[in-house]
């Protein structure tokens, strides 16, 4: 039984599809130590070793998060939300080029479910899309 080109191509693409699907599945959970249930992100680089909470906050601000906090596991970057409206505006404004879709993509990278363009710029809001 010979392996034809067609079977080899199908097998290769199937294998690549399965590997990319398994590799790209992201999981998020509430990080320890944050009491309002917001989703935070930990990076491999740990600015807490040299800069403490201030270094962590500066690092997180450069990553377009609003705050950072040093925990036992390292530096955690979090979007903090206003209690009244539960949305947060960011300095970077993807609305100028991408509109609402660009803002939503930007917010999802910040682990927030939706984004909307307002006069002030891109606002990331938790909740249903």
Curated annotation (Swiss-Prot):
Its main location: secreted. GO terms for cellular component: extracellular region. The keyword Heme does not apply. GO terms for biological process: defense response to fungus; killing of cells of another organism. It is found in: Secreted. Transmembrane segments: none annotated. Residues 1-24 form the signal peptide. Keywords: Antimicrobial, Disulfide bond, Fungicide, Plant defense, Secreted, Signal. Disulfide bonds join 40-78, 48-70, 56-75, 60-77, 87-125, 95-117, 103-122, 107-124. The keyword Signal applies. Belongs to the DEFL family. This is Defensin-like protein 200.
